[in-house]
Amino acid sequence: MNSDPAPAITGPPAVRVPGRRMEELSPDEALRLLGTVELGRIVFTRHALPAVRPVNHLLDAGDIVIRVQDGSTLAALLAALPGTGVVVAYEADAIDQGAHLGWSVVATGYATAITAPGEIERYAHLLQPWVEGTTSGAIRIRPDLVTGFRLLESRR
């Protein structure tokens, strides 16, 4: 039996980055910021693994609406669970690549297919697809949990 103490686990030295701090956003402010950008990422489960797709969106009465391509993985997932929906996360951000300042928001909730003809037509006019392919459907994400943070310059 070896009674020597186990060696301490060490890693790279701690790094302190001056000049920036993170501030948590309220859910209302996070949703407001989400409404100021057009592009985000939807995260859903595919074959028990996370799948991420860039999509454009709009914010409508607190819901996130995206268009979905016919025959896409996400469209098939929602078609398999009509009315029930699937749990998704939606992330959008605006972070300056040089200054590393900005914000990021994640909304988690259930996504359901929009089926009312009037709504589908309305969103078809408001939210234009930006990739090739047939896009006739739309999805509504009702956020249950909204989190976000802002990257700011440090207080001096």
Predicted segments with their positions:
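Short acidic/glycine-rich loop or secondary-structure boundary segments that cap or lie
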Residues: 52, 65-67, 74-77, 99, ...
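A generic local secondary-structure boundary/capping motif
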Residues: 31, 79, 127-131
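Charged, gly/pro-rich active-site loop segments
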Residues: 2-20, 88-156
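Short solvent-exposed loop/turn micro-motifs enriched in small/polar/acidic residues
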Residues: 35-37, 49-51, 83, 97, ...
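Compact nucleic-acid interaction/catalytic patches
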Residues: 59-81, 85-88
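Amphipathic alpha-helical interface surfaces
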Residues: 30, 73-77, 107
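Short beta-strand segments
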Residues: 37-70
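Short, basic/aromatic recognition patches
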Residues: 15-41
